[in-house]
Amino acid sequence: MLINGVKRMEKINMRQYFDYESCAYSYLLFDPCNNKSILIDPVLEKFDRDMGIIKKLDLDLIGILETHVHADHITGAFTIRKSTGVPIYYGSQSGVRGADFILNDGDCIQVGQFEIKTIHTPGHTKGCVSYYTCGMLFTGDTLFIGGTGRTDFQDGDAGTLYDSVTKKLFQYPEDTQVYPAHNYSGEMKTTIGEEKKWNPNVGDSIDKESFVEAEKLKNRPYPKHFDTAVPANMQCGRVSNK
């Protein structure tokens, strides 16, 4: 079965992990037939946890996929690469230094017998991407469970974010599972159908102009670790003294 040009397979394993400090999700995907695996959005402070899980499951880690330059925590990508030698992938508009591979819209990463498709979804930042495979969308900070990422820093743009969600992500089947990079209330996943129906920011009843105006009225403090996280993440998570 083909979904937006990607072969949909049923046997892909996915594990979801949480960092309580940043309320950030990381995802481990692996092919159960040959144990090829990738990490999406690892968190630096969870390096030991992530490497321990990969070792325990006897997985062959072949890549680290980032959805965007995070502003609230430092990615574990640089440290994992330093330890394992696996490559780091970012979207082509992210502006990061030191990534091994830059992904254009529609590019696919082969992991064992399945493909992960890159979808450029700018708006939260200009370099945001989402990833699709096997009926699952990993949406970073573009689409949340009942919300969307903020658009008031890192070259964010509300109109662009609205288009990324409604013209790209909402084109996937309604039963597509959505896994975001954050949740602050304990929810773990949603579906495209649920977000189209109920998302208060970008659901079917909200037009683009209303969303843009609502974003202008929001006044939120920057993330606590913004001043350290962004410079490090512009270098794939490299901390200046390492």
Predicted ranges, named:
Residues 2-4, 163-177, 181-242:
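Accessory terminal helices/loops
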Residues 6-59, 130-139, 146:
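Conserved beta-strand hairpin/beta-sheet module of binuclear metal-dependent hydrolase folds
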Residues 16, 28, 108-136:
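Core dinuclear metal-dependent hydrolase active-site scaffold
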Residues 23, 44-118, 197-198, 203-205:
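Active-site HxH/HxHxD metal-binding segment of metal-dependent hydrolases
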Residues 29, 41, 68, 80, ...:
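Divalent metal-coordination and catalytic microenvironments
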Residues 37, 87, 115, 120, ...:
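Hydrophobic "anchor" residues on beta-strands that sit immediately upstream
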Residues 42-43, 69, 93-94, 124-125, ...:
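Active-site metal-binding loops of divalent metal-dependent hydrolases
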Residues 64-74, 119-126, 178-185:
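Histidine-centered catalytic micro-motifs
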